[in-house]
Regions:
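Short linear motifs embedded in intrinsically disordered, charge-biased segments
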Residues: 1-183
Length: 183
């Protein structure tokens, strides 16, 4: 998965946008923000609902996001402006918050699916094959239950029941605060 993130960050579309279009002074800040919202974020986060986020992936995504936002704001790293201040100035929520909210939203969809749907069956499946040596990889189910516990305060044993209640789940996701120290 990390190679996929690295590939997306270094994609030709991103580099071309970052180097040529976004740095043009002729474009308004509003137009550059539109490019950020309509092209950059979807290319970077395609399929993000199923990602298991590690600290390294979080760091890489945040660095790519802030690199783009620095250019949108017309700033360089030498200006030493905090990420939080740049985001507030541009009116943009943290990309990691968007990813976490979408991942938890996908869990809500899974919880409300009727029995027999393929995504729900894959979610419930326990692999029977033998694992390779070393630390086991984190499964999406374990990652998402830990995320819900840390960020929403929903215990893992109650997670599916709470996620089935659409109104409650949506209100919890709307109240999801940014991670401390993410700015």
């Amino acid at each position: 998965m990390e190679r996929e993130i690295d590939r997306r960050i270094g994609a030709a579309v991103m580099r071309a946008l970052n180097r040529s279009i976004v740095v043009k002074r002729e474009l308004s800040r509003k137009a550059r923000l539109s490019i950020y919202r309509l092209i950059y974020i979807p290319v970077l986060t395609y399929g993000h609902q199923r990602w298991v986020m590690t600290e390294r992936m979080r760091s890489r995504i945040q660095a790519a996001e802030m690199s783009f936002l620095h250019r949108v704001a017309g700033l360089s790293l030498r200006d030493r402006v905090r990420s939080l201040d740049i985001r507030e100035g541009l009116g943009v929520e943290p990309l990691l918050l968007h990813i976490e909210r979408s991942q938890l939203g996908w869990l809500g969809h899974l919880a409300r699916m009727p029995s027999g749907c393929l995504p729900l069956e894959v979610f419930r499946t326990c692999p029977t094959r033998r694992w390779p040596r070393g630390r086991p990889r984190t499964r999406w189910r374990d990652y998402i239950s830990r995320l819900a516990w840390e960020r929403l305060g929903v215990p893992p044993e109650d997670l599916m029941e709470v996620a089935r209640e659409r109104a409650v789940w949506v209100s919890l996701l709307k109240l999801l605060p940014p991670r401390p120290g993410s700015g």
